[in-house]
């Protein structure tokens, strides 16, 4: 079962996230004129207007009120294209190796699970489980186009800089019935971690993590709010 879900994650993300990433990275004018998302997906989901996320599709007949428990798959994480090369060209004193990038991705995936478990489980009242079941909603997440201003690496030492943003990322989430595999929703959104008031601020690995927690917390709360609507909370 786990192998099947892992394979589903790899193939699904490769097929769908790429197109959403192109939509989210396009200039606003180009998005409106040339790259409007389709009204319906290949698997029957319908595009819905949502002021809080960039792209959202749902199964209009889905009833999520029957799901009181949530199973969160491991979060797939991918850096912005050529991020490592751009770090070298920027003249940064921090040398980022491929192993450093793998560690950062693992840390981001772990932080995703931690924050979403807190927001959906502890704060939201939904039971977080590790196995499928009739009342278990499966959450399949991915973070793509990850762009970190000051990378957090064990070899970086004390690294910091002044910047107006610690970085940015695009989140992608799908919701499934954990038993049947029926898909209920798909959404993607991009956010940047901005300094309070838009001013330059001192950014380092500690503030990076705090900013990432806030961004993930915002997304987790949005998902929780949508689930609460189905449950009449």
Where do the model's predicted regions map?
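N-terminal secretory signal peptides that target proteins for export/translocation
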Residues: 1-10
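Bacterial N-terminal signal peptides
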Residues: 14-26
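Short secondary-structure boundary motifs at beta->alpha junctions and helix caps
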Residues: 93-101, 163-164, 179-225
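Extracellular/periplasm-exposed beta-strand and loop segments of Gram-negative cell-envelope proteins
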Residues: 85, 101-105, 149-154, 193
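Extracytoplasmic/secreted envelope proteins and their assembly/folding machinery
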Residues: 109, 113-117, 143, 213-220, ...
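Generic short beta-strand segments
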Residues: 74-78, 143-147, 190
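A structural "domain/chain start" motif
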Residues: 30-110, 201, 225-233
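Surface-exposed short loop/turn segments
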Residues: 118, 122-182, 194-203
């Amino acid at each position: 079962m786990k192998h099947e879900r892992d394979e589903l994650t790899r193939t699904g993300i490769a097929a769908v996230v790429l197109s959403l990433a192109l939509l989210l990275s396009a200039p606003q004018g180009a998005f409106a004129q040339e790259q409007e998302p389709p009204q319906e997906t290949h698997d029957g989901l319908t595009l819905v207007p949502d002021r809080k996320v960039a792209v959202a599709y749902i199964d209009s007949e889905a009833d999520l009120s029957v799901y009181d428990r949530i199973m969160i798959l491991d979060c797939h994480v991918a850096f912005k294209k050529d991020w490592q090369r751009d770090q070298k060209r920027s003249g940064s004193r921090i040398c980022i190796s491929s192993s450093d990038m793998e560690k950062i991705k693992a840390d981001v995936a772990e932080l995703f699970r931690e924050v979403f478990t807190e927001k959906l489980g502890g704060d939201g009242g939904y039971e977080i489980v590790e196995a499928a079941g009739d009342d278990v909603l499966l959450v399949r997440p991915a973070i793509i186009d990850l762009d970190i201003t000051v990378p957090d690496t064990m070899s970086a030492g004390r690294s910091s800089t002044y910047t107006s943003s610690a970085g940015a990322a695009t989140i992608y989430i799908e919701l499934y019935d954990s038993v049947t595999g029926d898909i209920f929703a798909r959404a993607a959104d991009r956010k940047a971690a901005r300094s309070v008031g838009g001013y330059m601020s001192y950014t380092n690995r500690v503030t990076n993590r705090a900013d990432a927690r806030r961004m993930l917390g915002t997304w987790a709360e949005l998902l929780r709010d949508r689930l609460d609507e189905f449950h009449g909370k």
